[in-house]
Amino acid sequence: MPLPDFHVSEPFTLGIELEMQVVNPPGYDLSQDSSMLIDAVKNKITAGEVKHDITESMLELATDVCRDINQAAGQFSAMQKVVLQAAADHHLEICGGGTHPFQKWQRQEVCDNERYQRTLENFGYLIQQATVFGQHVHVGCASGDDAIYLLHGLSRFVPHFIALSAASPYMQGTDTRFASSRPNIFSAFPDNGPMPWVSNWQQFEALFRCLSYTTMIDSIKDLHWDIRPSPHFGTVEVRVMDTPLTLSHAVNMAGLIQATAHWLLTERPFKHQEKDYLLYKFNRFQACRYGLAGVITDPHTGDRRPLTEDTLRLLEKIAPSANKIGASSAIEALHRQVVSGLNEAQLMRDFVADGGSLIGLVKKHCEIWAGD
C-alpha cells in the first residue's frame, strides 16, 4: 500500500489510545474475552472508540480528535463507565499497567483480524509475547515537514516519557528489576526503537518506499517505532509509555506531550542532526531500567545528567506552552511526581514488599482503575 499524503491537521490537537488489560477474577489472570466486551459496548459509546488490539486479552480505548486534555478526559471518563459496567456484567475486570505480572504469553490468542493474523504469520511467537499494554498519544501537525521536526524533537525526551509512565516491573511472575520492562518485548522486532534518520517529509517518503520492498510493511501501522508519523491522521504518534494505572495519570502524560510539542514547534529550539541519536538507546535503557533514577548522556558533549533533574528542567521550559493550551494542571501534577521521586513501578514493588501477592496486585490495580 503506498504511503498516503500527509493529512493537514489543526496543530496541537490530541488523540489518545490506552491499551487496557481484561482480567478474569478471582484468579486475575488475563482473560481472552475482549471481543465479547467490544460487542457489548459498541452501541453505547457516544465519543471515542473501544476496539481490539493484538490479542484477546487487550482492550483499546481511543479518543476522538480533542482540542485539549479536558476534552480527552471527558471522553475517557464516559468510555470508562460503559466498559466497567459491561465488564461487571460479564464477570470481568479492567486495569492498567504496562505488563500483566504473571500471565503466560503462550496462552494469548491473537485477534481474528486480517492485519493481526498477517502479523502473526510474519513474526510468530513474538506477537503473542507482545501482549503488553501502552499509551499512545497523537499530536496534530500542519505539514509533513513539521511532523518530521516534531518527531526528532520529541525523541530527545523519550527517556523522560518512559520514566514518568513506568509501570511494568513484573513480567511472567518475576521482578524484572526494570521500572519499565514493556519496551524490551519489542527488541527482537526489526523496526524496534527510533525511526531511521530523515530530515524532511520527502526523505521520509523515500524511506517508506524502501521499507515496503521488504514485503513486511503494508502500511505505516506496520512500523512500530518509538515515535512515528501518521500521515492518514496528520499526526506524530508517541508510543513509548506504559499504560498508567489511572485515567488521571494518562491524561497528564498526554498533556506533557502536547505541551512539549507546542514548545518545540513554536520555539524551534533545536537544529536536529543524525548525531542526536548516537546515544538514544543507551539513554532509553537508563529510563527503562531505573526510571527517574536513571542518568542520561548528551551525545554532543558527553555531559551526564540525572533524569530527575533533566525532567524538572523540561517541565519548566514547557510551562508557558502548557498554559496556552490548557495543560498546566498536567505539568503541575507531573512536577509533584518528579519531586516525590515515585512512579507507579515503585508503588507496585512497595505493595509486594509489604506482603502482597501478584494476584493481589492485579486486584488492586482493578480497584484503582474503577475508582479513578
From Swiss-Prot:
One of its GO terms (molecular function) is ATP binding. Its EC number is 6.3.2.2. Pfam families: GCS2 (PF04107). Keywords: ATP-binding, Ligase, Nucleotide-binding. It catalyses: L-cysteine + L-glutamate + ATP = gamma-L-glutamyl-L-cysteine + ADP + phosphate + H(+). GO terms for biological process: modified amino acid biosynthetic process. It is an enzyme of class 6 (ligase). It comes from the Bacteria. Homodimer. Belongs to the glutamate--cysteine ligase type 2 family. YbdK subfamily. PANTHER family: GLUTAMATE--CYSTEINE LIGASE 2-RELATED. ATP-dependent carboxylate-amine ligase which exhibits weak glutamate--cysteine ligase activity. This is Putative glutamate--cysteine ligase 2. It comes from Escherichia coli (strain SMS-3-5 / SECEC). The lineage of its organism: Bacteria, Pseudomonadati, Pseudomonadota, Gammaproteobacteria, Enterobacterales.
